[in-house]
């Protein structure tokens, strides 16, 4: 698996409620396979602490990349949850890449919405 933003192959896996998410150790981005992100955003936020992180370097956030699963070019699109966040989506496998810090922004928006 290669990071779509910084091209490293150094990932750590975090398993939350049976869902495994890969985090790039260099740029702190997160890879979610199909439907994993929406499932996790509906979980109790206390379980999601291992996925929270600092914002990545801006140079990585603007970069277009390829899907780490199938090398399809990722499509950048505004998140329906928080339009201030641009997510990178693979149209082939439906996976989603979030740059460092974007998971936090989405989670905070979900928490505000659910109050």
Regions found by a protein language model. Name each.
Residues 3-6, 24-27, 67-70, 90:
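Short cysteine-rich clusters marking metal-coordination/redox-active sites
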